[in-house]
């Protein structure tokens, strides 16, 4: 259903994430002694700087997530326009965080042919846009190397719950199934990476957060694995 502007129905549903859902996720992460990476728009820094401050105070990582949710990138966009979009996002986040993010996730994983090079030129060390592997890897650009950390959207709550209309409990089962499979591969072929990608306004709802807390507790109790930020994963891949 399309809602006419001003679309408060969708806007406030998502704002629930910054007002309520985020803090439930932070409590769940703290209970599991886990740090995480938060893909964050420049607009969040401009409008809700306290959100950035709370994330950093808890030891979490900020990953630049474009200027706002309309800041998609595609071939055909002028290079200067794309550079400005990247720079505006990084500058807004740096102004509040006190440091420039090392990582980048594009809106809808959108990139142009020039994006990897422009990210390196802007000081980005890794991106999370390419989902074609279970391990991070380095790619070459004309400006130098860029690490890709494959945060697969197939395992996100937006895909499993939002698109496929499954429950939070079903999401947890699928993460556990993926964990068991990857552990089996790791025993034969070396380490594997399992991204857990959740969204505050989706997983932070009161009838879903319990399943997420239980999932984190279960993962924390497993041997031979650990929670890592995307930045830590990227550093290990260098």
Placement of each model-derived feature along the sequence:
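Alpha-helix N-cap and loop-to-helix initiation/capping positions
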Residues: 17, 77-84, 166-170, 207, ...
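Metal-dependent polysaccharide deacetylase catalytic core of the NodB/CE4 family, i.e.
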Residues: 4, 32-112, 144, 150-163, ...
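A structural motif corresponding to the C-terminal end of an alpha-helix
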Residues: 25-34, 92-99, 185-189, 219-224
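Active-site-adjacent pocket scaffolds in enzyme catalytic domains
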Residues: 91-190
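C-terminal domain-boundary segment and adjacent tail
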Residues: 126, 176-238
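Generic structural signal for well-ordered alpha-helices
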Residues: 22-26, 49-53, 86-90, 116, ...
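Aromatic- and glycine-enriched glycan-recognition loops and surfaces
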Residues: 13-26, 30, 42-49
């Amino acid at each position: 259903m399309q809602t006419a502007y001003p679309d408060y129905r969708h806007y406030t549903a998502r704002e629930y994430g910054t007002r309520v859902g985020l803090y439930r996720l932070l409590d769940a992460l703290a209970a599991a002694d886990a740090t995480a990476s938060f893909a964050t728009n420049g607009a969040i820094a401009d409008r809700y700087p306290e959100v950035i401050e709370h994330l950093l105070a808890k030891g979490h990582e900020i990953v630049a997530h474009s200027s706002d949710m309309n800041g998609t990138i595609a071939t055909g966009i002028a290079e200067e326009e794309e550079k400005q979009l990247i720079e505006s996002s990084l500058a807004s986040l740096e102004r509040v965080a006190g440091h420039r993010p090392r990582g980048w996730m594009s809106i809808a994983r959108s990139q142009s042919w020039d994006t990897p090079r422009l990210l390196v030129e802007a000081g980005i060390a890794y991106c999370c846009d390419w989902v074609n592997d279970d391990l991070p890897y380095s790619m070459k650009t004309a400006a130098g190397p860029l690490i890709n950390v494959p945060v697969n959207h197939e395992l996100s709550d937006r895909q499993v719950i939002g698109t496929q209309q499954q429950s939070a409990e079903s999401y947890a089962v699928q993460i556990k199934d993926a964990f068991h499979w990857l552990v089996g591969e790791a025993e034969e072929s070396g380490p594997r990476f399992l991204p857990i990608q959740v969204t505050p306004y989706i997983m932070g709802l009161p009838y879903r957060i319990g399943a997420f807390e239980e999932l984190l507790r279960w993962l924390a109790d497993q041997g031979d694995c650990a929670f890592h930020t995307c930045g830590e994963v990227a550093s290990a891949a260098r």
